[in-house]
UniProtKB/Swiss-Prot annotation:
Gene behind this protein: hemL
Similarity-based family: Belongs to the class-III pyridoxal-phosphate-dependent aminotransferase family. HemL subfamily.
GO cellular component labels: cytoplasm
Protein name in the entry: Glutamate-1-semialdehyde 2,1-aminomutase
Pathway stated in the Swiss-Prot or TrEMBL entry: Porphyrin-containing compound metabolism; protoporphyrin-IX biosynthesis; 5-aminolevulinate from L-glutamyl-tRNA(Glu): step 2/2
């Protein structure tokens, strides 16, 4: 491992950034408020590694918060985007690539008979909320504490991601009348869902099938199936927000993994291979309510951008079932190794993975809800984060964010990562001053 050099160039750029951006960043969690210290400024990435502007090299387990399932700058994606760029960067018209990517998605998620591309996951979930309300003629939406569905007003109620990291349960600026239409309960509390759904006519029950914006929280056995039953019995639409889980936890996403088909699905991250794109979709019957075939309006200048479509086609094309299985195997090796390190050092640790999505909490016992997650040792996480960073391992700068693997993380990368994390945990246990 090459010794880290001081982050002088990063500090200089961040000082300038704070003059131009709130907190110096364009998304709050990047500001390191959850761990303290100064962010490094990224310069380039390749494969399993990322480099900062000072030349320091890291094994990357953030992977742009999930999209880079093939790793940084995979040749297949670079080639596809380069070829598309030669033909034009944007048209604002239908293109063949839009259809090709939609076909690739439907091939893995057959329940998505029709989709609509957007430029961000927030656009996709906002559009789903509008569609669900229009179709059901109801106004209330049920979400779960700590689940993050983008920064649309309807979803900034007891949300996850940066909202959780900064300790903001809600956001100022959301009208009270609108906030009252978003109901919440604890993830995995099926009894609470049942009570709410019987008392209030719900337009939709929306969830991250595996919560990645409060750390990494899996549904308990029967929870997803129970939501499907309640939705069917009460007339609500079941919505999977698979912006994070889509094509990561299984070849066909949460529907394949859990054997439950939602009414509507939001996708993002992986389907753009690192470029800005998201989508929402469902049955033809539901999606034909969207303009121009129906009255529910949604539009976007850059929706279906040809460069993003090219990146998505290349990514899904390379992400075969065998490649997906191998990434899952390497993720299991990493998580098992991390558990072993914690056990040897006598540290309580809950570490889990599904597919190539993983996470851990410094605490005993399984984590079933955001309240459980908040009982973890956040101070130890902060020290561990910084110790890992100085040893060339880049983790998410928050105890409440999932981590990711890619096809570029092979046995050698996993082995070296575990060696560094072992050393990092030892340092974190002795560094009681923290950061």
């Amino acid at each position: 491992m090459t010794e880290m050099v001081p982050h002088a160039r990063s500090a200089e750029i961040m000082a300038r950034a704070r003059m131009r951006f709130p907190g110096g960043v364009n998304s709050p969690v990047r500001a390191f408020r959850g761990v303290g210290g100064e962010p490094f400024v990224a310069a380039r990435g390749k494969g399993a590694r990322i480099w900062d502007v000072d030349g320091n090299e890291y094994f990357d387990y953030v992977l742009s918060w999930g999209p880079l399932v093939l790793g940084h700058a995979p040749d297949v994606v670079l080639h596809a985007v380069s070829q598309a760029m030669l033909e034009g960067t944007s048209f604002g018209m239908p293109t063949a690539r839009e259809v090709e990517l939609a076909d690739a998605i439907a091939g893995r998620m057959p329940h998505l008979e029709m989709v609509r591309f957007t430029s961000s996951g927030t656009e996709a979930t906002m559009s789903i909320a509008r569609l669900a309300r229009a179709v059901t003629k109801r106004e209330h939406i049920l979400k779960f504490d700590g689940c993050y569905h983008g920064h649309g007003d309807s979803f900034l109620v007891r949300a996850g991601s940066g909202v959780a990291t900064l300790g903001l349960p809600d956001s100022p600026g959301v009208p009270e009348a609108l906030a009252k239409l978003t109901l919440t309960c604890a993830f995995n509390d099926l009894d609470a869902v049942e009570r709410i759904a019987r008392d209030v006519p719900l337009a939709a029950i929306m969830l991250e099938p595996i919560v990645g914006n409060s750390g990494f929280i899996e549904p308990t056995p029967g929870f997803i199936q129970g939501l499907r039953r309640i939705a069917d019995e009460t007339g609500a639409l079941l919505v999977f927000d698979e912006v994070m889980t889509g094509f990561r936890i299984a070849f066909g996403g949460a529907t394949e993994y859990f054997g439950v088909t939602p009414d509507l699905t939001a996708l993002g991250k992986v389907i753009g291979g690192g470029l800005p794109v998201a989508a929402y979709g469902g049955s033809r019957t539901l999606m034909e309510h969207i303009a121009p075939t129906g009255p529910v309006y949604q539009a976007g200048t850059l929706s279906g951008n040809p460069l993003a479509m090219a990146a998505g086609i290349a990514t899904l094309g390379a992400l075969t079932r065998s490649v997906h299985d191998e990434i899952t195997n390497q993720t299991a090796a990493l998580v098992d190794g991390l558990r072993g390190i914690a056990t040897r050092r006598g540290v309580p640790l809950s570490a889990r993975h599904v597919g190539s999505m993983w996470g851990f909490f410094f605490r005993d016992g399984d984590v079933h809800s955001f309240d459980d997650a908040k009982q973890s040792d956040v101070a130890l996480f902060r020290r561990f984060f910084h110790a890992a960073r100085t040893r060339g391992v880049s983790l998410a700068p928050s105890a409440f964010e999932a981590a990711f693997m890619s096809a570029a993380h092979g046995p050698a990368e996993v082995g070296e990562t575990l060696s560094r994390l072992d050393d990092a945990l030892g340092a974190a246990l002795t560094d009681t001053a923290g950061h």
